[in-house]
A protein has these predicted regions:
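Alpha/propeptide regions of enzymes that mature by internal proteolysis
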Residues: 32, 123-157
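Residue-level marker of positions within ordered structural domains that often coincide
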Residues: 13, 45, 152
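A contiguous strand-loop segment
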Residues: 24-125
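Positively charged n-region of N-terminal signal peptides that target proteins for export
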Residues: 1-6
């Protein structure tokens, strides 16, 4: 082996071992088959795996929006049944899921990029946390057109 190779191997090992770049974010993807069917997927890039589990919410499940101050926000009931992965005991914080109409929604972590409305007395009653947005979308919308039509009914507060 030429003398440079052991040196490069040592540098590479030290670089990988000493440089710590904790991943903190998520990546999503959608694959569309020739027949038009879609398969979605995502990563959860956190230092520790979240305590997540599968949840199913039937039509009529009641939810209450969470605001930064701890006051209750918008109250809503599921118009559509949906299932997904949650990180909360009550299942209201959905990481991603799909409703009975086939609409898929997911929450992604973009620290330093995502901006949310400030809570005010005027918007608190329609408020919910960023982590509840996918829950609200899947509970209330059958397709993307409905999401666009209804999104102003809520205030995502952060």
């Amino acid at each position: 082996m030429p003398p440079i190779r052991p040196f490069l191997a040592i540098v590479l090992i030290l670089t990988c071992g000493l440089v710590d770049h904790p991943a903190c974010g998520c990546t999503g993807t959608a694959l569309v088959a020739k027949d038009g069917s879609v398969v979605v997927g995502r990563t959860l890039e956190f230092g520790m795996p979240p305590d997540s589990h599968l949840i199913v919410h039937p039509v009529g499940t009641a939810f209450i929006g969470q605001t930064p101050s701890g006051e209750s926000g918008i109250a809503f009931s599921a118009q559509y049944g949906f299932a997904g992965i949650t990180v909360s005991d009550d299942g209201s914080l959905l990481l991603d899921g799909t409703n009975e109409k086939g609409l898929n929604a997911a929450v992604f972590y973009f620290p330093g990029y995502a901006k949310f409305a400030e809570a005010t007395p005027e918007n608190r009653k329609r408020g919910l946390s960023p982590m509840q947005l996918s829950t609200w979308i899947l509970a209330n919308c059958a397709n993307l057109a409905e999401v666009k039509q209804k999104i102003d009914q809520v205030a995502v507060l952060g």
